[in-house]
């Protein structure tokens, strides 16, 4: 809303040219009124038509005066604007770069410096901030390209009376003409202890933190030498240039959110951090080239509407010439990373001391506190709570690396569940399986010297009995039977020695009554002769498979 001006106000010479049209109009109207009064004196009895014309002229004069002096009375006619020019405009731009929201005392100083009323200074700053928010909202993005920001700095002297503006983010505390973006563009390998990520917003439910400004290049050396996350170190890096920073600690494997705010003229640093091990799911969404084209088209349409609303042809041409510079490159693609966590994060706060006499390093530590988000949404955003993820928006390249870093950590540090190491026999090539009956030099204690003899492996008597029965029905030569008997005797010697050294002669007599299959039959079916684990700590003195057929009864069988 523009200020109501009176004609007898003594303006500064910088704005005299802006009011020439008002003074000229005033002189013409006064001359016309004087002529009408003179004609009225010459004609004492005017005709009714002339009186009607005089009243109409007087009403028209009153309407013109009201339309030109009261800008708050909105009507079909667009009100004229008062613009700052020359040195006054340069001063306003410099002050806006330093502080876009000056206080009443600061606006008064600016007013005295340029000879402009304080209300006009306040309106100029309001219109400049409103124009920035309008272009941010029109682009449907969280950032403003640097070239577009330079255009904003050039045309903010044009006033705006649009009351339908929607604010989507706070205004940056410091604006940089060379690079007005929200991206810090810190190399990922710039620090040996921390990874810095280009994040422009953090959202958890309806709680949202938008980034303003960017880290200054003169602080890159401090970033490179950062060794701890003390409040003073973090504040020195942010240095009133940005109010949001996200990093991951390599040593502690923690994700850290840092942001700042002002309350009662005191700067407050906030910190939210949680371990990577609490992240149970990552969901990365990347912006496509079609999204960039649509964003550029929206930006061009917004610039076109702004140019149509402006009554300055020179500035309109300037915006049209620079519209092609508003296109974002593919390297500036945006991304969105959603993190689902299994526990609540930790919250900390630090109040910066403004006392000049006190050393700030005396209390250089974070104070653990409760959740300071709206409705404690961040504290409850975990699996089993509200199940709401942490949504991070930022530079696509940076989010890609962050997603890969979390996944690599999870894959290398997660404790896998206990897996049964037993290998199915079908999966093992049969040529690599040595038949246990033929290895006369092997022992159950060879693979593990500490194995107790009582816990040594033994044969499955059911399988062996079946094999013996099948062998009795088959035909074999006497030489084959004798060779099989000799091999089995060697195996029995080892088995008997591992079972409390029983009498080998008795075992040979029992075995002589059995007819075993030859070696070829055993190798052909190795799966029928697998060993089984013991089920009892006390083994019988004489295994069943060593007994003759008559002794294999229920009275003699052991369980």
Swiss-Prot record:
Phosphothreonine, modified sites: 542
Biased composition (Low complexity): 24-52, 63-74, 293-307
Pfam families referenced in this protein's UniProt entry, alphabetically: Homeodomain
Location relative to the cell: Nucleus
Taxonomic superkingdom: Eukaryota
Keyword hit for DNA damage: no
Feature: DNA-binding region: 77-136
Statement: the UniProt record of this protein carries the keyword Zinc-finger: no
GO terms for MF: DNA-binding transcription activator activity, RNA polymerase II-specific; RNA polymerase II cis-regulatory region sequence-specific DNA binding; sequence-specific DNA binding
Region (Disordered), start-end ranges: 16-88, 132-158, 293-333, 534-559
Listed SUPFAM superfamilies: beta-sandwich domain of Sec23/24, Homeodomain-like
Feature: compositional bias, Acidic residues: 308-323
Polar residues bias (residue ranges): 141-151
Bias (Basic and acidic residues) ranges: 324-333
GO cellular component, one term: cytosol
Entry's Gene Ontology BP terms: cell differentiation; chromatin remodeling; positive regulation of phosphate metabolic process; positive regulation of transcription by RNA polymerase II; regulation of histidine biosynthetic process; regulation of purine nucleobase metabolic process; regulation of transcription by RNA polymerase II
Keyword annotations from UniProtKB, A to Z: DNA-binding, Homeobox, Nucleus, Phosphoprotein, Transcription, Transcription regulation
PANTHER family: HEMATOPOIETICALLY-EXPRESSED HOMEOBOX PROTEIN HHEX, HOMEOBOX PROTEIN HHEX
Note: Present with 6420 molecules/cell in log phase SD medium.
Biological role: Regulator in phosphate metabolism and acts as a derepressor of another central regulator PHO5. Binds to the upstream activator sequence (UAS) of PHO5. It also binds to the TRP4, HIS4, and CYC1 promoters.
Protein name: Regulatory protein PHO2
Lineage of the species this protein comes from: Eukaryota, Fungi, Dikarya, Ascomycota, Saccharomycotina
